[in-house]
Amino acid sequence: MAGAKEIKTKIASVQSTQKITKAMEMVATSKMRKTQDRMAASRPYSETIRNVISHVSKASIGYKHPFLVEREVKKIGILVISTDRGMCGGLNVNLFKTTLNQIKNWKEQNISTDLGLIGSKGISFFRSFGFNIKGQLSGLGDTPALEELIGVANTMFDAYRNGEIDAIYIAYNKFVNTMSQKPVVQQLVPLPESKDDHLNERQQTWDYLYEPEPKALLDSLLVRYLESQIYQAVVDNVASEQAARMVAMKAATDNAGNLINDLRLVYNKARQASITNELNEIVAGAAAI
């Protein structure tokens, strides 16, 4: 059994670590709530644009934007959104497994894949697999800005326009609640039909006067909408990261508390044994006299 002094030093070390994990838990909680506010603020914007796109695309008779046209799929581009930092449990690992499984399914259908990567964890992971990486971005921080994402987004959009890829998907961790984050791989381009499109079609009995013409407006709206979808996915992923980190740090704090209690018990036993030995020595010495 270790001496009482060594155990006391160990207790102090674990207490110091516990303070750090508790602080990280509180910081993650605060950041998660702020990110949830950004998520809520951005949703009405993208939903409104989607409704306008639905109406304008029906008004643009004789014109089909490339982002709305299905074509034979031979190669798919996936934009994978991961974190820049660790200590968030299995968040990134679960996303990477889901993405690789989807890539495997496409490969069985003779469909190849190119990647666009956001987040240093994803960059370091997928580089080792030898994928063709169209673009990458890291260092977004906790408050990502849309302007920072446009470069990677346009790289994927240009590849689609030029026929280098036939569809674009986005992989990220969808924030469900504090305790649950779901890795998803969903289609971005061609723009999948929304469930609300048919409802809007039945409800709208009026038409609009478009300035400029519907074609030019649709071109602009589609790019803005897709950029907003990527931004929404990044914000979702940040919220998932902070939630996962909060849970991981809480578990670490609780485990540290349990370890401290165990060490204190061992310390008390060691101290008691030391006192008992000293008493025995005193008694033995007195008996010898």
From Swiss-Prot:
GO BP term (any one): proton motive force-driven plasma membrane ATP synthesis
Chief location: membrane
Family annotation (PANTHER family): ATP SYNTHASE GAMMA CHAIN (PTHR11693), ATP SYNTHASE SUBUNIT GAMMA, MITOCHONDRIAL (PTHR11693:SF22)
Entries under InterPro entries matching the protein: ATP_synth_F1_ATPase_gsu, ATP_synth_F1_gsu, ATP_synth_F1_gsu_CS
Key words of the record: ATP synthesis, Cell inner membrane, Cell membrane, CF(1), Hydrogen ion transport, Ion transport, Membrane, Transport
Pfam families according to UniProt: ATP-synt
SUPFAM superfamilies for the chain: ATP synthase (F1-ATPase), gamma subunit (SSF52943)
Subunit text: F-type ATPases have 2 components, CF(1) - the catalytic core - and CF(0) - the membrane proton channel. CF(1) has five subunits: alpha(3), beta(3), gamma(1), delta(1), epsilon(1). CF(0) has three main subunits: a, b and c.
Name of this protein: ATP synthase gamma chain
Stated family: Belongs to the ATPase gamma chain family.
Subcellular location: Cell inner membrane
Name of the gene: atpG
One MF annotation (Gene Ontology) recorded for this entry: ATP binding
GO cellular component: plasma membrane; proton-transporting ATP synthase complex
Function field: Produces ATP from ADP in the presence of a proton gradient across the membrane. The gamma chain is believed to be important in regulating ATPase activity and the flow of protons through the CF(0) complex.
Membrane topology note: Peripheral membrane protein
